[in-house]
Amino acid sequence: MGNLEILAKTFLVYGIQTTGKSAVNFLFSRGAKTVYIYDDGDCDEIQDAIKLDNFDDVKNLNIDYCILSPGVNVLGNKNIELLEKLDIPYMSEFCLGLTKAQGRNVCITGTNGKTTTTNLIYDLLRTQNNEVFLCGNRDTPITQVVNNTTKNSIL
């Protein structure tokens, strides 16, 4: 997915909280033709996005890709099973951002100590480079900052 084409494509963003809203704005900024939005709970309207009230509506739409917010559990999720049945590729908002980010990436995973480790690495990198972005699931969505990255950036 490193060369993900966004221009003139149709997307579904599944999960419309902070990260989902950021993904919608990012997709439109990169020339997406249509962006549908869906959330298992209540979600606000987003300008230019088309809200789906029923996930089964994806059967009648020509969706190229689905972007998942971090809160969407893929295991045992009937909506994800439908995407797979319809051969609609899906990825996280974070992966979407990584496909378009310039520069280098530092990714931290694990069970304990992620926030402390992230803050420590961020502070260390900032002493050497002023193009360091702190983003991901805990703070700022990656799609909120990726349009500001350069080849010298570190995410």
What is the role of each PLM region?
Residues 1-92, 96:
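N-terminal leader/targeting and accessory segments in enzymes
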Residues 10, 58-61, 74-155:
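Phosphate-binding loop of NTP-binding sites
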